Amino acid sequence: LQAITSNPVTTTTLARIEPEEAEPGWRLHWSTAGHLPPLLITPGRPAEYLFAEPGVPLGVDPEQPRPDHSRHLPPDTTVVFFTDGLVEHPERPVDESLAQLAGLATAYASLPLQEFVQVLADHHPSDGHDDLAILALRTPRL
């Protein structure tokens, strides 16, 4: 890990999606390095976070193995990856902001993906003083 700082530590998520062989839909595989969990929005259900055992941030212990996770995704499911700048606010616990983001995602899940992401960016629960990045994908309908 090459760094331009004296504290070379960062968080991230590595994920891939592939067609599911056992049932209709897709399979999400992911591993985190201390990053916030992805947000899953399945049609007709409230948004939920994919809480799973996190790995340590990059730069902490490169020899430590990272846990891998897997989840079935039905057709038309949205997965949202985001930086902490979307939810961190100095005046409230991050769990409260995560709940607010999940509620927002549930309320606007039926929007086309680009509009959905724009709503999350425009109405984020953070104070707006940190970097903000959102990556969302929606599985195709079968």
Give the predicted meaning of each segment:
Residues 59:
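Regulatory/sensor and coupling segments of signal-transduction and defense proteins
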Residues 1-56, 66-67, 123-126, 136-137:
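Catalytic core of PPM/PP2C metal-dependent serine/threonine phosphatase domains
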